Structures are given as C-alpha cells and as structure tokens.
Regions:
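Sequence context surrounding c-type heme c attachment/ligation sites in exported
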Residues: 26-47, 63-154
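Boundary at the C-terminal end of the N-terminal hydrophobic targeting segment
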Residues: 21-25
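Short, structured beta-strand/loop micro-motifs enriched in basic residues and often containing a Trp
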Residues: 47-58
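Bacterial N-terminal signal peptides
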Residues: 10-18
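Bacterial N-terminal signal peptides that target proteins for export
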Residues: 1-10, 91
Length: 154
C-alpha cells in the first residue's frame, strides 16, 4: 500500500519534520510522512490505527541498536466502519527525547517518550489527551514502551 492511499492528506501537511529539542514539550505532528514507514495496523475500541516510524529508526533496530532519541512514532486513528477505514479520528505521536517523560507521574511514565494527540484538523488536543496512551503503553516497558517493536525489526 502506498502512503497516499492510507493517509490522503499527507501532502497537505507539508514537507518538513522538526524534532523536539527539550523534554517536556509536546511533540509536534510531522508535517509529512516522508521518510516514515508503515509498520503496523491494529483494531481496538471501534478504531483502526495505522502506525508509522522513521526509516532511520527501523534501520537502527535492524542493526541491533535501540531506538535513538528523536525517534517519532505516528499513529493515525480512523473510525472502524465494518473493517474499513472511515474518517480520521485523531493523530497520535510518541517521540523519544533525552530526559523525556519527566513531567509525567512515575505511575504512567514511559521511559523517555513524550506523547501528544491531535484532532483531524491537526490541532493539539490539550485537555488530557494522552492519559489512556500512557497507561496502556506502560505495560510494554520490556519493548521500549512500544507495541509492535518486533514488527519494526522485521
């Protein structure tokens, strides 16, 4: 599948991706998925979620390294319409940042990962957007807080 078929508005997002330099700042939604690779699709809670990560991060994993700081994982959640992607519900980003996650309570902290969530119009959701994400990903400490780490490696 081509990205444009999965993410028809990718071109409208622009062409650049800016990494977050300081921990504690909400990650930015990439302006484009250029340089990202689709690595997983999951269905949960009436949603279909496609996940993307930078090709350079996958290459690091495949060469036996851990995911480097600056790694961004983008999730695009669609309404599940009988097994087909409906409208985009939200965009989610996890970004691994040196000393990241320090502003989250220890009970939900996910290592150095920062999280953010965005509306279909790409506006940052600020009223408790990621508590559910943090709680769920906390269970994946053994895989750098990621679901699908093995898919990234293959």
């Amino acid at each position: 599948m081509e990205l444009r078929n999965l993410f028809p508005v990718a071109g409208a997002l622009g062409a650049a991706f800016f990494l977050i330099a300081d921990a504690g700042a909400a990650p930015s939604l990439p302006a484009s998925l250029n340089g990202f690779v689709h690595y997983s699709t999951s269905n949960y809670g009436g949603k279909i979620s496609d996940k993307y990560v930078q090709k350079t991060s996958i290459q690091a994993l495949q060469s036996g390294k851990t995911l480097p700081n600056g790694t961004a994982v983008v999730g695009i959640e669609y309404r599940d319409q009988n097994g087909k992607r409906g409208p985009v519900l939200r965009y989610i980003i996890m970004e691994k940042v040196r000393n990241g996650g320090k502003d989250y309570p220890a009970s939900v902290r996910n290592g150095d990962w920062e999280f953010a969530s965005f509306t279909p119009a790409r506006a940052l959701i600020t009223n408790d957007p990621v508590t559910r994400c943090l709680a769920c990903h906390k269970s994946q400490a053994q895989s750098d807080y990621l679901f699908g780490l093995n898919e990234m490696k293959s």
